[in-house]
Structure formats: C-alpha cells, structure tokens
Amino acid sequence: MLIFELSKTGRQAKAQIPRAVGKNYSIPEEFQRKSPPRLPACSELQVVRHFTCLSQKNFSIDTNFYPLGSCTMKYNPRGVHKAASLPGFINRHPLAMDNESQGFLETLYKLQNYISEITGMPGVSLTPMAGSQGEFAGVAMIKAYHQSRGDTARDEILIPDAAHGTNPASAVMCGFKVVEIATAPDGDIDLDELKRKVGPRTAGIMLTNPSTLGLFMRQIKEIASLVHQAGGLLYYDGANLNAILGKVRPGDMGFDVMHLNLHKTFATPHGGGGPGAGPVAVGKRLIPYMPLPVVKKTDSGYHWATRQDYPQSIGRLSCFMGNAGILLRAYFYMLVLGKEGLLRVSEFATLNANYLLKELTKVGYTAAYPDRRASHEFILTLNSEKKNYDVTAMDFAKRLLDYGVHAPTTYFPLLVPECLLIEPPETESKEELDAFVAVMKTIREEASKQPDILKTAPHTLPVKRLDDVKAARELDLNYFATHE
C-alpha cells in the first residue's frame, strides 16, 4: 500500500519540536513556496507505522546477509556518519570563501593524499559524483590526452567480455568504438587475442583486477606492456579494489587512470540512487587533464585549484565540490582503520571468499573456476542443477530470499552459464558464512526433491517475481498521474 492511499482530509501530524541548532536559518520570502506541497494527509502514527513496515520488508546490510557479487555490501560504521555530520562540515555553504573553509579543505586535501597513497597514483580529483561518472571522467581524460598529442586516430577502447556494463557505456559516451577481448578458459584474458587487436587505433584498455570472475589477472604486467608499447593507456575499474587494499596498488601494476567506488571499498552509504562519489586517480601524464576542482596546498593555506592551474582539464562534472558529505565519510573510514586496518580489509575479504567457496563445494556446488584461488568474490555455476533438477540460478536466488538472505548477483558475468556471483565482505563473521552454507545446502536438497518450491519462490515476501520487461516499458512512478 502507498502512503497516499492512507490519506484522509483533515488528518495531520503535530509539528515536531525544533532541535537546538544555534542560528536560525530562514528561507527568504521570494524563495518560499506559494502553495503547499501535495503531501498525504496522515497522522504521525500512520506515517511511522507505514515506513517502519516498509523497512521491515526490505533487505539491507543492517538486517540481512547480503552477498551481492561485485557490489561489496559491507557494513557502514555509524561513527563515520556521525563524524561527517559535525556542524563545521554540514553548516558550511558551498560558496564559502577559501579562508572560511580551511578545515574542510584540509580534510579533502588529506583525502586526496590518502587515495594517492592507496592507488599508487600522484594525481587525484574528488569531484565525480558516482563510480560511473568517475569512470566516464577517466575515459574522457584518456581521450583528452591523445587529442592533445594530435593522436586523433586512436578511436578504440579494448574491453574484456567479463567487464562491468558501465565500461563499454563510458567508452561509447566518450566517442570510442568498443573492441571486445575474450576470456581464456582459465579465467585470464586471452593474450593471443589481445595481441591481435591492440594497435595504432588503441586509445586504451579498461580492466578490473581482480576481474568480475573473482580472479586476479596474473598477466597484468604483460598486458600493460603490450598496451603501452602500442601507445595506449590502461584504465582501472576500481569496483574490486577491496580485494587488494594494502597488497598491491593499481599504479604499480601499470595503470594510468582509475576511479574508486567509495560506496564499495570505503563504506559510504550504498544503494538508494545516491548520493555517491567516484574519485579518480591518475598517473603523472594525465594530471593536467583532471576534472576540477581539486584542492591545492600553498604557503598561505588550502585553496581550490582553478582552470588557470589546469588549462587542459576536462572541466567540471558537478556543481561545487561534488558530494562532499560522502567524501567526508570515506575520509573518516580511512582515518579510523588506518593503514593496517585497510590491509586487514583485503585480507579478511579474501579469506571470507575462499572459505565460503570451499565450504559450498563441499555441499555439492560447482565452482566456475575450480583450479583458481578466489579473490574477494567467486562464481558458482548451477549448470548441473539446471540439467538434473530443471531449476535455474534465478530460482535459487529467489528461494534464498525466503531464508532471509539477499540473493547473490545472478547471470553476471554473462560468459558463465547459470551463475551466482557471491561476495562475502570482510565485515561478515564465520558464523554468518556457515549459516549461509547451511541454507544453500538445504536449498540444493529442495531442488532435488521438491523443485517446484524453488520455481515458485519467494513464498514469504509481498513482492514475488516481477515482469521486468513490463516494468521497464510501462513506468508508473507518479501516484497522481495514475490516480486522477
């Protein structure tokens, strides 16, 4: 039920007692609404019950195990959110002068330095407002670099067939042609195909390491050498950075540019459509093209760098500083954990993944790459379950919901049939992993004896199986558009 359906003329919630906020900030009359918003007329109790019930029907990191592969659904520490909400941060106006924002600017400057140290890249811009926008910025910098050298014939970006879908999207948005590179049977890139396809038209290659197959790319140094010798650059998709924190740096692997997903690796709020942040880090040759603004330190303090400092910049990607509140959360997360803590993040994430993979194979599941060690995530292929029991990976995923577990990523990467991509982040305990194994064992037994239970799942949730095509083609997003 929608809250609008609870509405009845005359009902209202009592005004909340205002918090003590120091100064009283009022909105000038010329900016105030001329008519009241079309809000539902409900009592405070109705509103509280409605949204509390909705929250109890949702899966979340706070309430459920959430092994969504390639998403790193880790716990967001509450203390980090509290620190980012200090009055000095949240009451600062985006147009405040530099001399009125020294604490804020110093924090962002330190965050730039932390990211530089983590990635092994000297240049950092914090402004992109999502991982996808950071990815676009990275490819745009590759294009600007080649154009500045008069190397305009480079119109191709090489992308593995196991890549995230945003990779080809970013390349196309920047005007490049996408050239797909196949994956070899062992899960690594097919080097022979790469050698055939790299050449004078290659602007760069986009890679995730570890890949979306949950495997570390063992020939990365050779790949970097091949692409660089051909005049191209290497782009690092930071989606799986959680697996290598403190162990190896993208810059040391030969990458020239990357973006970071703060909502994955650095525990900022995840999902809900934002706000987000996707900082970019670059090697020395791409520093002139970084998006603005960036924070600079001089003898007189901290300042925003301008177009005069970076005349070849690809420009702005957002108003002001991007989503500063998200950047602050990532900064405090790094500050709380420290260097040793971030190292343990990757160690525990990798340990959890390999332990879970081993335990699931013990109860009958098949690893997509049984001869390879997992990084932070791994893939099960349910081909035999489909053949023997006529149940699909989607059926398994839907049945997991009945057991209070959010489903893993299904049918991605596309090259692995009937796959589940499973990622148990470092914040999950052994007890939680063992409980998940027990559930997976039970579901597999159900598939062999009562497959219809899986085919008709979920049975305990208000929303069953949606018509994805209908939902995408017939949008129903506005209550008043369909009820007036």
UniProtKB/Swiss-Prot annotation:
One annotated Gene Ontology cellular component of this protein: glycine cleavage complex
Coiled coil: none
InterPro entries referenced in this protein's UniProt entry, alphabetically: Aminotrans_V_dom, GcvPB, GDC-P_C, GDC_P, PyrdxlP-dep_Trfase, PyrdxlP-dep_Trfase_major, PyrdxlP-dep_Trfase_small
Gene Ontology biological process terms, A to Z: glycine decarboxylation via glycine cleavage system
Highest taxon listed in the record's lineage: Bacteria
Enzyme class (EC, first level): oxidoreductase
Keywords: Oxidoreductase, Pyridoxal phosphate
Cofactor: pyridoxal 5'-phosphate
Record PANTHER family: GLYCINE DEHYDROGENASE (DECARBOXYLATING), MITOCHONDRIAL, GLYCINE DEHYDROGENASE, DECARBOXYLATING
Function, as annotated: The glycine cleavage system catalyzes the degradation of glycine. The P protein binds the alpha-amino group of glycine through its pyridoxal phosphate cofactor; CO(2) is released and the remaining methylamine moiety is then transferred to the lipoamide cofactor of the H protein.
Subunit structure: The glycine cleavage system is composed of four proteins: P, T, L and H. In this organism, the P 'protein' is a heterodimer of two subunits.
Protein family per UniProt: Belongs to the GcvP family. C-terminal subunit subfamily.
Name recorded for this polypeptide: Probable glycine dehydrogenase (decarboxylating) subunit 2
Record lineage: Bacteria, Pseudomonadati, Pseudomonadota, Gammaproteobacteria, Legionellales
Gene, per the UniProt record: gcvPB
